[in-house]
């Protein structure tokens, strides 16, 4: 080129060809990720890279960088003093051809992914859907999102600055990195643990005083609830999401042990077996373990003077407990499977490789016996079809959806809307978690979104067009 022939006049400059990515669809942005120039440390320490090379920064681009990048080729050329091409050195004897990277096949159902992204427009939160029988991630949505092509080309730095300074954090992958209180969805786990440890049976009843719900201590402290019939059994407690029931069950569970420390250690072990409090060893390089405090945390905080009622908020998924949406979806898949799961993963096939990582094909069991899941699941079904169900508006004709609403307290504004579900009840095809920040009741936003996603995936159509229109028109992002 003309410029190349003149470069000898500009010391330190050279021409270099780069292969640029193009993302033909704006869908699955947080999943796919994006490329960026390698940093100085990587360029110096990794012999594959040189300054100016591109590598994966986030998503699949980063997690499967080695599979995608291929092998570099090399061509040695002769040039004259004016940098003009004089042909190959020794007829290309030392040249090598580049080898293309592997082709990856993802687990994503692209139509479901696109639909979920439409439903989450003008909202902040996440959706994660998993196939329980395989652990394959069917959709993983973080909202708001962004156009990945903004991070390609000359204006990449300028666009990145704008995106990174956006108060709604579109670059932040809430599905993997957002840590939230699970709210009442976590009552299911506490119910399972209480059953396993004989703190309660399916016929154990607890009274609820309505507004004051569960009262405890000499000062008359309480965990509030809402007016409903009382007393309640386990299944009814799930159906109407009674705080008092699960606080009582939590206290009964603790009473089975000789000390608070012993009880909490046992509880912590059970909860951990659901993939909570750890990274789950999936095929993403980014993600957070959430927050599941150990006994030592409370021993230090309360100087050894604490009991079940001190941490009673954990009974209803509040307090120090924080989960990521992918953990909530995996928790739901475990319930759907009656006690086991496959590590959630996003890649199902890599060209040139016969099998995927065995970590993704090996069953992992939680610590709860299979027989204790049925009463929990029966209660979850009543959430959508029962007279007092908290998500009656999300039932679908001829399809048993087992779900649980959650409304998590938010110190920064409106409560968060949560819903976890799987369907159908027997031989489940999909497990899903929906989290809508500042969405209020779980039944208002999260449950309808989950129902629409389930309908789309299983029935391939939408039976409730009015509900769909309500969600599509909903705008929960406040404009300044």
What does each model-found stretch correspond to?
Residues 14-16, 30-34, 105, 126-130, ...:
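Soluble periplasmic/extracytoplasmic beta-strand elements of cell-envelope proteins
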Residues 57, 328, 442-447, 451-455:
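Short, charged, low-complexity patches
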Residues 52-80, 124-152, 267:
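Carboxylate/His-rich catalytic cores and anion/metal-binding grooves
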Residues 2, 85-126, 270:
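Conserved, well-ordered alpha-helix/loop/beta-strand core segments that scaffold catalytic motifs
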Residues 21, 114, 126, 440-441:
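Short beta-strands and strand-coil junctions in structured, solvent-facing domains, enriched
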Residues 1-101, 434:
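Small/polar-residue-rich segments within soluble enzyme cores
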Residues 80-85, 90-93, 133-184, 189-442, ...:
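Beta-lactam-recognizing serine transpeptidase/beta-lactamase-like catalytic domain environment
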Residues 355-364, 451-480:
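Short, gly/Ser/Thr-rich active-site loops of penicillin-recognizing serine hydrolases
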């Amino acid at each position: 080129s003309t410029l190349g022939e003149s470069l000898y006049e500009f010391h330190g400059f050279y021409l270099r060809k780069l292969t640029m990515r193009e993302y033909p669809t704006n869908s699955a942005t947080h999943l796919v990720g994006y490329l960026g120039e390698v940093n100085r440390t990587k360029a110096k320490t990794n012999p594959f890279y040189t300054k100016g090379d591109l590598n994966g920064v986030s998503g699949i681009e980063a997690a499967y960088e080695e599979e995608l990048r291929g092998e570099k080729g090399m061509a040695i050329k002769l040039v004259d003093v004016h940098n003009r091409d004089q042909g190959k050195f020794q007829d290309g004897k030392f040249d090598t051809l580049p080898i293309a990277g592997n082709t990856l096949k993802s687990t994503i159902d692209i139509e479901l992914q696109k639909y979920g992204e439409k439903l989450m427009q003008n909202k902040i939160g996440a959706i994660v859907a998993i196939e329980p029988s395989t652990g394959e991630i069917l959709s993983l949505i973080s909202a708001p999102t962004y156009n990945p092509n903004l991070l390609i080309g000359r204006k990449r730095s300028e666009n990145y600055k704008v995106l990174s300074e956006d108060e709604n954090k579109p670059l932040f992958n809430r599905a993997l990195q957002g840590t939230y209180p699970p709210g009442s969805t976590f009552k299911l786990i506490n119910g399972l643990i209480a059953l396993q440890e004989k703190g309660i049976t399916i016929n154990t009843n607890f009274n609820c005083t309505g507004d004051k719900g569960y009262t405890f201590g000499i000062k008359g402290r309480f965990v509030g609830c809402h007016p409903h019939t009382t007393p309640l059994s386990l299944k009814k407690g799930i159906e109407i999401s009674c705080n008092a029931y699960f606080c009582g069950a939590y206290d009964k569970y603790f009473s089975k042990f000789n000390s608070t420390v012993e009880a909490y250690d046992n509880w912590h072990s059970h909860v951990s077996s659901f993939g909570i409090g750890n990274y789950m060893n999936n095929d993403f390089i980014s993600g957070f373990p959430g927050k599941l405090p150990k006994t030592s945390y409370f021993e230090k905080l309360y100087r050894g003077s604490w009991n079940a009622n001190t941490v009673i908020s954990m009974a209803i998924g509040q307090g120090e407990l924080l989960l990521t949406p992918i953990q909530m979806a995996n928790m739901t898949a475990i319930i759907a499977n009656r006690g086991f799961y496959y590590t959630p993963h996003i890649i199902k096939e890599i060209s040139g490789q016969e099998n995927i990582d065995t970590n993704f094909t090996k069953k992992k069991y939680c610590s709860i016996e299979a027989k204790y899941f049925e009463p929990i699941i029966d209660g979850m079904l009543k959430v959508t079809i029962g007279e007092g169900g908290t998500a009656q508006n999300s039932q679908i004709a001829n399809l048993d959806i087992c779900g649980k609403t959650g409304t998590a307290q938010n110190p920064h504004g409106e409560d968060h809307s949560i819903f976890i579900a799987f369907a159908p009840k027997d031989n489940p095809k999909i497990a899903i978690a929906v989290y809508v920040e500042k969405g209020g009741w779980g039944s208002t936003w999260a449950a309808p979104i989950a129902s629409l996603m389930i309908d789309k995936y299983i029935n391939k159509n939408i039976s409730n067009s009015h509900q769909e229109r309500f969600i599509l028109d909903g705008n929960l992002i406040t404009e300044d």
